Amino acid sequence: MLFRSLLNDNPDNYYQNCVIDGSYDYRIFGTRGTVDWFSMGSKGSSTDVAVMVDTGYIDSSQMEFAPDGSFEIIASATKQPGNWLPLAPTSRSIIVRQTFGDRKAEKIAEIQIECLNPDKPNNNLTPEALERGLMGAAGFVKNIGNMTIAWEELYRQHINQLPSDDQERCQRAGGDPSIHYYQSYWKLADDEAMFVQLDDIPECQTWNLQLSNYWMESLDYRFFKVSTNKHTAHYEPDGSVNIVIAAHDPGPKYPNWLNTLGHGEGGMLGRYVGASVFPKEMKSRIVKLSELS
């Protein structure tokens, strides 16, 4: 399986992306699987991450499924009965987020897509089309790099804090409209820890907090605990959650330890998914590791 980490990609997500043209109609179909939740959003660009504005949205809580878990969605500019993903003439991509509660235990939805009204096929590759494709790919890489640097400089203005982010900016970069983002930057000495206390968790589909490196690439969640969420976290008797971010295990009193994996600084991102109210911040403070023992 190919892994691509960028812009604080969610360790709880399985991402899928498809280039489309909003002037056509598409049938998206498949089987539900057991993944906790998934969403599909049509976006206004497939290569420029600065203008990937939302042009349509649907998620599994809004969909109808057959008894065997199969489903069908029509993606089009014209409203359709049943499961419908709106498109606009400017739509250029569809992004799928399959969000796990427990990644190791759940099965992803199997999804396919077909165009319902394609033009007559033309497989003749022209020099102009090749140039557009290559320049688009190069532009995507350049835009990602520039955006990463710009965002990290911005988030270092509130280092080791988790305030509510600029949601409009997140959406322009391809964010999910059902997610409220808390994006920031952490920096810790070897003997320090960041103590995050979630004592006002809203009613939501799920929530999570993750760590990334300087380049906003998620740390290796395949083999290490670098994130936690609604389903995997340990809760206190009062329903709150205490999370410790540190280079060293703070001990059994703090089961929600996120390992910085040798990094001294990097990005971090908290999310509330499907909530209607949001705290202004995820509360945090810096402590010495020795204070936690």
Regions found by a protein language model. Name each.
Residues 1-293:
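A compositional/structural signature for long, glycine/proline-rich flexible linkers
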